[in-house]
Amino acid sequence: MAVKVVTENRRARHEYHILETFEAGLALRGTEVKSLRAGKASLQDSFARVENGELLLYNMHISPYEQGNQFNHEPKRTRRLLMHKYEILRLMGKTREKGLALIPLKVYFKNGLAKIELALAKGKKIYDRREDIASRDARREIDRAIKERMRLH
């Protein structure tokens, strides 16, 4: 099962508490697949939403394919995500809760098929982010001190 990661949304883990992750297929056009294989995609500011029983992805940027012609795709078009109906209904129920959102974490190819990892997430407050940074810095300091101590012995 070969997995080739195309793009990751690194900011998502900093700005949101990840509660649960899901895998969905991406419904793409031909030139979009070629651009994705070339790694020309961005998940910045993108999000997913359930509308009329369909799971849709907004604001994902896939650059137009360089060798494409006039039938090239629109870079930020709304794309359909493919999941089982019961999974979509479950997500619809969960996203109705206040403060929960569907955030894409990464896009990858799995067995030749374009997939996206979605996260059910809750936005972090500024003080939560500061706490995370402080704990990470403290952990680094401790690791550095242990490493220094080991070097002396």
Curated annotation (Swiss-Prot):
Gene Ontology terms, MF aspect: RNA binding
One GO BP: trans-translation
Pfam families on file: SmpB (PF01668)
Subcellular localization(s) per the UniProt record: Cytoplasm
Gene Ontology CC terms, in alphabetical order: cytosol
Keywords annotated in UniProt: Cytoplasm, RNA-binding
Role description: Required for rescue of stalled ribosomes mediated by trans-translation. Binds to transfer-messenger RNA (tmRNA), required for stable association of tmRNA with ribosomes. tmRNA and SmpB together mimic tRNA shape, replacing the anticodon stem-loop with SmpB. tmRNA is encoded by the ssrA gene; the 2 termini fold to resemble tRNA(Ala) and it encodes a 'tag peptide', a short internal open reading frame. During trans-translation Ala-aminoacylated tmRNA acts like a tRNA, entering the A-site of stalled ribosomes, displacing the stalled mRNA.
NCBIfam families in the record: PRK05422.1, smpB
Matching PANTHER family: SSRA-BINDING PROTEIN (PTHR30308:SF2), TMRNA-BINDING COMPONENT OF TRANS-TRANSLATION TAGGING COMPLEX (PTHR30308)
Family label: Belongs to the SmpB family.
Name the record gives this protein: SsrA-binding protein
Phylogenetic lineage: Bacteria, Bacillati, Bacillota, Clostridia, Eubacteriales
